[in-house]
Design a protein with these regions (language model features):
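Short N-terminal or domain-adjacent regulatory/targeting segments
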Residues: 1-3, 101
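A generic structural signal for short, non-catalytic loop/turn and secondary-structure boundary residues
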Residues: 5, 58-60, 68
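Negatively charged, low-complexity tracts enriched in Asp/Glu with abundant Ser/Thr
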Residues: 5-53
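Glycine-centered structural positions embedded in regular secondary structure
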Residues: 22, 29, 64, 98-102
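Generic secondary-structure signature for well-ordered alpha-helical cores
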Residues: 28-36, 57-60, 103-115
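N-terminal small/polar loop signature for handling phosphorylated ligands or for N-terminal nucleophile
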Residues: 48-64
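Mid-chain, well-packed structural core segment of small domains
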Residues: 62-91
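Ser/Thr/Gly-rich flexible loops in soluble cytosolic domains mediating phosphotransfer, phosphorylation
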Residues: 80-115
Length: 115
């Protein structure tokens, strides 16, 4: 098997209505830290935390990001309880907040401090 399916990546589960700017900033934040992302359209939708938890469960790196239609983002680790994400942005998130969410996910993967 070849292609991105073999490459470990932080999975980004996005609701079909996710604003493009949110997705762009989140992925840029992770990639700035040297961690690749793989974007998956989540057909069932859901809130950012539920999407992030599902992404973390499916990721070979045990880390996932969820993006909902409102523009909220959540970062999750596969070993955390579903409603206990590692980080979230609110509905009033800014591009800096979304990029920080991507960096946070990458830093969890690398085992670095989040601050």
């Amino acid at each position: 098997m070849t292609g991105s399916a073999e490459r470990p990546a932080v999975l980004v589960y996005r609701h079909p209505g996710t604003p493009p700017a949110v997705l762009r900033q989140v992925c840029a934040g992770a990639e700035e830290e040297g961690v690749p992302t793989e974007v998956v359209d989540a057909p069932d939708g859901g809130d950012a935390t539920a999407l992030a938890h599902a992404a973390a469960q499916a990721s070979r790196l045990d880390v996932g990001i969820g993006l909902d239609a409102s523009g909220a983002a959540a970062v999750h680790h596969g070993k955390l309880p579903e409603r206990g994400p590692a980080a979230t942005t609110g509905l009033d998130g800014t591009p800096a907040d979304w990029r920080r969410a991507g960096r946070t996910a990458a830093r969890v993967v690398k085992g670095l401090p989040l601050g």
